[in-house]
Amino acid sequence: MNPKILVVLPFSANDGVMAEHLCDFIYLANRRVQEGHCLLVVAGDVHDEMREKVRVAAQVAFEGVDVITAPKKVDPNKNVHVNHLFRVAAEHIAASYRTPFLWLEPDCVPLKYGWLDKLAEAHFDQPKRYSGPLKRTLNAEAIVFLNRVAIYPPDCIKELAAPLGTQGQFNLVAGPVVAPKATKTTLIQEVAFADESTIVSPSAVLLHADKQGTIMNQLRDKFEQAAKKK
């Protein structure tokens, strides 16, 4: 039996449609076979209709789906909202699950068939608590930190509670604590600061920050053909 990781998909009113499209694309990338378990983390500003659309799309894509709703948060700082959703998810996971989880944001794109199994296998084949892209800040401090889209242990709230309470990006604030406990992987590619001509890494199975849907659209025909041939 292949090792499994929980897929955690957070979304707010601003990216609910993107989350729905991601679930549709995951089903296509998996050759129209339900795979894995998903936890939807719904922000308090999402209306019922959008929540239901994403839930239905997730139920098509995954073998099992759980849904939790975060209390509404009013703050102009985007980091605070992301930190809030992650805290709600991490606290719930610590109490309800025993498996590592992939924090999968709505602007992610699976790049290859079997992407989730490959991520799980690589994670369980390394000795550390976390795995994902490791980055370095560009300032003089050059802090090494784990990319937000990464695989986390189910009890990560123990290490992330304090960073999640700050105004900054929790993963950057937690860098000095988390980075030494993380294994760098090339399976997840981060393109948040790249242009649309970004070349997809041959080793990557998941890409983050396809905000315009450019890469997803490029891959759609390829996955459509593969799904028909299965």
Residue ranges of predicted features:
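Acidic donor-binding/catalytic loop of UDP-sugar-dependent glycosyltransferases
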Residues: P106-A122
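Short beta-strand-to-loop acidic/aromatic patch adjacent to the donor-nucleotide binding site
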Residues: Y97-V109
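Catalytic core and acceptor-binding pocket of nucleotide-sugar-dependent glycosyltransferases
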Residues: P110-Y113, D125-K230
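N-proximal low-complexity "stem/linker" segments adjacent to membrane-targeting elements
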Residues: M1-Y27
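Short, acidic, metal-binding catalytic loop of nucleotide-sugar glycosyltransferases
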Residues: D24-G36, A61
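Short acidic, S/G/P-rich loop/turn micro-motifs used as interaction or catalytic elements
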Residues: F11-M18, V46-E49, D107-L111, C156-E159
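Active-site-proximal specificity loops/subdomain of glycosyltransferases
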Residues: V42-R98
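Phosphate/oxyanion-binding active-site loops and adjacent basic polyanion-contact surfaces
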Residues: N14-L22, D75-F86, K112
